[in-house]
Amino acid sequence: MSLSSTDAAFSHLQELLDGLPGMQELGEKARLAHAADEAAALDHELTVAHATLALRESDLAEARTQLEAAETAGDATRADHFRREVLFYADQVALAKGPVNEAEFRIGNLLKREGAESLQALQIHALEAATLADLEARIAAYQDDYQRTYELCQSFEVVDE
């Protein structure tokens, strides 16, 4: 390999090293965008879980009201039916608490991992999918260029003068 191509390879490696802080900033921006996506998904998951729990609690309250009315009216058959309804909906409420607890746990882990105060604090870093894909493509191209250039520079023989 000629001296000029060797110099060009090392010069390009230096350019890549000089650009490293900028690429690290882009990497951090991409990481935060992924955290924002995760925050949005968990926020939605928690909202759905709370809505499901509220619906089950409403069903349970209605069954209890119907049970009380049947008992007050002395209707043993209806009271027996609504006792079973109360047990069923009490079970449904207990089951609906699981997804709420799971979402809250995962949100807590995300906030701790990212050092954020709230999901909204993370969601401000959201990027459009195309913007994030472009950013990740730029980072991947830089990493590929760096790896190829570094390996090329390592392949040069050291010649004693």
Regions found by a protein language model. Name each.
Residues 1-161:
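Extended, charged heptad-repeat coiled-coil rod domains that mediate dimerization and scaffolding
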